[in-house]
Each structure stands twice: as C-alpha cells, then as structure tokens.
C-alpha cells in the first residue's frame, strides 16, 4: 500500500499560506547557489513555483566559490530576508562544514547549521532538517510512534542522524536502531522492525524479504536509473507494507516544510 504524501504536503501548505496572510508582510526566502548540478538547479526552480503559490518572495543568488561564505554572512544581517537556503552539492575543494556554519542560525530554514542540529540533542526542534522532519510528520500521521521499533538505514548528517534524535524525542518515544554500510545482519534487523526508514542512495536497496508484513517504510532515496527517478525501496515491498512512493513521497513533504520554516523564521524575527 502506498502512503498518500500529497495530502500531507497539501495540508502543510494550506496552513503555511494562512500564516503568511496573518503576518502582515511578505516573507522572503533567498536560495544561494554555487553549483551546476542539474538536480539542484531543478529543485531551485521548483522552489520558485512553490513560493509564488504560497505568497512568499523568492530570490536565487548565484555566487562563486570564493563568495559563498561571505554572501551567507551578509544575508544574516539583511532584514529583508527571513530564510536562507544553500544549494548542494558544493564544488570540490570547498569546506562544507564552514559553509553550513555560515548559514544564519535564525534564518536556517533547511536546518543545516551545526548549531541548529545540536539543539536536537536537547529535544528542541526550531529548524530541524526538512527531510528528517518530513519523515517524522509522515510517520506521526500513520501511527503512534511510542514504543515502536524503528530502524534508520543511513547515518547522514541531514537525514539519518537527526532523524534518529527526533524519533527518540520525549513524547515520540520510539526505540531506534541506526544501521549503515558496516552493519552486520541488516536483513535480520529490518525484518524485526515496525518501521524502516531508508536513506542510502542506492536504487531498490531494500527488498521485500527484508521487511515484515504490515510494516511502515519511509523511502528517502533519490536515484536516477536510465533517466528515471527511483527510490531506495524495491517496488515489491509495497505488496506487504505501507510505503512512501518515489517520486511524490517524502520529497513533496520536505519542500512544504521548507516554506513552513520560512514563515516560522519570519514570525520569530518579528517578535
């Protein structure tokens, strides 16, 4: 069974639009780009369309590798800008940690600054990473997480690690296992899980025999195979479990949350 993520994204967007109207001013998102990656550029185009739909001002700033850090710092003091997004991947040779640390904390709508990531250790979700939060929102709609055995396959800074912390948060109270490329007996672990979240970047990695019947599976994968977008979960898993589709799944909710964060940032800055 496929999980309906479109309805979740639409609900977030409707609430965001209502909050924009109550602000009394037009919030603004600036996306900083220092990449020629086709998928990154495509995402920036989709951001523009979504911003127009929600009544949010939007600007793309194309910068050189030498300018990216200083540009991000300047945006921090620009009162006309409420949210800052930085497109990835970065050109080879750039210090990713330095760049992400330069995203203004109070405008870090994608939740990539180490300062915002660190708050997750204290159960504070001011600007959590959008993809990790999308997985949580979907799961909370599908089930009560308390006591559920959740396996997160992947330990990235943007998905796996923050998601594990968010699922452990008091009030959600999931029992979380994080697996990775060196995990022994992965199939045994996923097969005994109520929920499996996969974010490894390998098309159709999670097979039907690795999932128990009735489980919930969140597919965070983005892989292009012969020009077609594929997830990390094999389509056959849908026969025995509830699965988020790719495309049209976690990605839609992620984008909706990005703009929810822009409005949240604007509301916090207005106070």
UniProtKB/Swiss-Prot annotation:
Binding residue positions for NADP(+): 154-156, 181, 222
Gene Ontology cellular-component annotations: cytosol
Protein species of origin: Thermotoga maritima (strain ATCC 43589 / DSM 3109 / JCM 10099 / NBRC 100826 / MSB8)
S-adenosyl-L-methionine in keyword set: no
Record field: catalytic activity: (6R)-5,10-methylene-5,6,7,8-tetrahydrofolate + NADP(+) = (6R)-5,10-methenyltetrahydrofolate + NADPH; (6R)-5,10-methenyltetrahydrofolate + H2O = (6R)-10-formyltetrahydrofolate + H(+)
Entries under PANTHER family matching the protein: C-1-TETRAHYDROFOLATE SYNTHASE, CYTOPLASMIC, C-1-TETRAHYDROFOLATE SYNTHASE, CYTOPLASMIC-RELATED
EC number: 1.5.1.5, 3.5.4.9
Function comment: Catalyzes the oxidation of 5,10-methylenetetrahydrofolate to 5,10-methenyltetrahydrofolate and then the hydrolysis of 5,10-methenyltetrahydrofolate to 10-formyltetrahydrofolate.
Sample GO molecular function, one term: methenyltetrahydrofolate cyclohydrolase activity
The protein's name: Bifunctional protein FolD
Gene field: folD
HAMAP family linked to this entry: THF_DHG_CYH (MF_01576)
CDD domains given in the database record: NAD_bind_m-THF_DH_Cyclohyd (cd01080)
Record text on subunit structure and interactions: Homodimer.
Family: Belongs to the tetrahydrofolate dehydrogenase/cyclohydrolase family.
Annotated InterPro entries: Aminoacid_DH-like_N_sf (IPR046346), NAD(P)-bd_dom_sf (IPR036291), THF_DH/CycHdrlase (IPR000672), THF_DH/CycHdrlase_cat_dom (IPR020630), THF_DH/CycHdrlase_NAD-bd_dom (IPR020631)
This protein's record includes keyword Hydrolase: yes
Family matches, as SUPFAM superfamilies: Aminoacid dehydrogenase-like, N-terminal domain, NAD(P)-binding Rossmann-fold domains
Key words of the record: Amino-acid biosynthesis, Histidine biosynthesis, Hydrolase, Methionine biosynthesis, Multifunctional enzyme, NADP, One-carbon metabolism, Oxidoreductase, Purine biosynthesis
Pathway the protein takes part in: One-carbon metabolism; tetrahydrofolate interconversion
Entry's Gene Ontology BP terms: L-histidine biosynthetic process; methionine biosynthetic process; purine nucleotide biosynthetic process; tetrahydrofolate interconversion
